[in-house]
Amino acid sequence: MKVLLVTGVLGLLLLIKWKSQSTSTSNQTCQCPTSPWVIYAFYNSLSLVLLLCHLIPEIKPIHTSYNTHDSSKQQHISINTGNGK
């Protein structure tokens, strides 16, 4: 999972670098946006988004379990996660 996170961040950085290069050289006629490393960067940033969407439901109950001020809210959350699985 850490490998996906690292490659996703690298892909996002490559995509940002490509975007900044394409805006600085906008007077050229052929920018060739389908070079292999741009496709690789797009794929890695997409995998990062999918990884984060997969991890967000797992992180949410951890944050809500530390909320000890409202016990009825805690019971409501635990019932919802129990029925959801």
Swiss-Prot record:
Keywords: Host endoplasmic reticulum, Host membrane, Membrane, Transmembrane, Transmembrane helix, Transport, Viral movement protein
Transmembrane segments: 3-23, 37-56
Topological relation to the membrane, as annotated: Multi-pass membrane protein
GO cellular component terms, A-Z: host cell endoplasmic reticulum membrane; membrane
Positions on the Cytoplasmic side per record topology: 24-36
Topological domains, Lumenal: 1-2, 57-85
Superkingdom as given in the UniProt entry: Viruses
GO biological process annotation, one example: transport of virus in host, cell to cell
Subcellular location: Host endoplasmic reticulum membrane
Family membership noted in the UniProt record: Belongs to the carmovirus double gene block protein 2 family.
Function, as annotated: Cell-to-cell movement function.
Name assigned to this protein: Double gene block protein 2
Species assigned in the record: Turnip crinkle virus
